[in-house]
Amino acid sequence: MPITFKKIDKEDFLEIRKNFLENYKNLDDFDLNTAIRFHKSLPDHKNFQKKIEQSVQDNKIMTQAHSKETLLEDLIKNLNTFYRVGQADFLSIIIDSHTRENHYDNAKVILEDSIKSNKSLLNGFPLINYGTKLARKIINDVEVPLQIKHGSPDARLLVEVALLSGFSAFDGGGISHNIPFSKSISLKDSLENWKYVDRLVGIYEENGIKINREIFSPLTATLVPPAISNSIQILETLLAVEQGVKNISIGVAQYGNITQDIASLLALKEHIQFYLDTFSFKDINISTVFNQWIGGFPEEELKAYSLISYSTTIALFSKTNRIFVKNIDEYAKNSLGNTMINSLLLTKTILDIGNNQKINNYEEIIFEKEQIKKETAQIIAKIFSRCDGDLRKAIIEAFEYGVLDVPFAPSKYNLGKMMPARDSEGMIRYLDIGNLPFCPLIEEFHNKKIKERSMKENREINFQMTIDDIFAMSQGKLINKKSRE
């Protein structure tokens, strides 16, 4: 049976929305008309999607920084510093973990303690507890577009408050913000929650407000094979556009090998457009984001900044639209220090130097791109074959049987049988394919690549390869070579 895509009827959705927000009527004013008027009152340069479109016209790769302060004034100060000193083109606000998990009362208590002590005590910004009125101060006081980054499998209330406040971008999805983040939340629930979120975005789009919806590409950010991330981004894109989302960002979290990083983004762009065309989704704007290295950084500062430089160079030649810049002190309690600014300026300088340069799609990139597309196509085809008209149901079954499998994910709804490792060139391959629906040729290809590394390093093929690869980059290496004693 062919896949059936059906947008929730507007009146039906508004009734669903009314019933949902009834539980939070004392929390905020959820008037859509007021929110739409506020968005329309903002200048174009504060709208995330409009600025992306301008950067495409200007053939310019944009930089994006992030901040995670609990206190409002600290957050605004930090964001403005990243814009004025670090020259960031876009900014993100990281939401605290209590809000991500819908524990708003816990966030409220710690926010109150933070205000009393004049110190950020949460690991992010508790947007819902501040409410729309105070959140609009951020929009008004910061001169660049702002995105909400979170990690919530149920982002309905968070996105409601974000859009009401004037934010014009956020990331996530029913798969990408569940499987890598949560242990016990079912895909059925998270996919349904994000169906609400996507339809809400559709309502704003129908009223002339451009909202950028980024698919969260890094997943666990631990040796995720490109075909896994690309497959999930394709599926989440289809589910989003079904509900009226018009502006989507897709991307790559740096894998490590230059050829594979460039190839994976090329493969993703081609495949996304192919599936949008296949299902006759028109007028969908696709942009790309390259996430600098998300794993551990070397402890030595110069080595850490070398990794920022390496990431930027790859992003430059991938011709992405936007780079999500990382802070080498990523896990510090707050990010008011200079390391984020240093990363921004370093990234900006490399982009300025390399702006008019390019790498032609030489043979190795084309080969790897086609390899990723073959793997992705076989995963997607298997999921579609089990659809019975319902894509969400097929996605749930795909994870249950390991047709889709994210390495090192905490979710009990993820099979966790597939195991990755790098080959001798540092490309991510499959040490154990698990239940991924690959043909024998693909399986042979990966076995050969892993065997080549084994012979080159004179080591056994086992899980120790994977462990070594996980920690290699934090030691300033792409591959941690350990030969048999």
Curated annotation (Swiss-Prot):
The keyword Transcription regulation does not apply. The keyword Isomerase applies. NCBIfam families: MthylAspMut_E. L-glutamate binds at R100, K149, H150, D171. CDD domains: Glm_e (cd00245). One of its GO terms (biological process) is anaerobic glutamate catabolic process. Belongs to the methylaspartate mutase GlmE subunit family. Adenosylcob(III)alamin binds at N123, P180, F297, K326, E330. Its EC number is 5.4.99.1. This is Glutamate mutase epsilon subunit. GO terms for molecular function: cobalamin binding; methylaspartate mutase activity. Pathway: Amino-acid degradation; L-glutamate degradation via mesaconate pathway; acetate and pyruvate from L-glutamate: step 1/4.
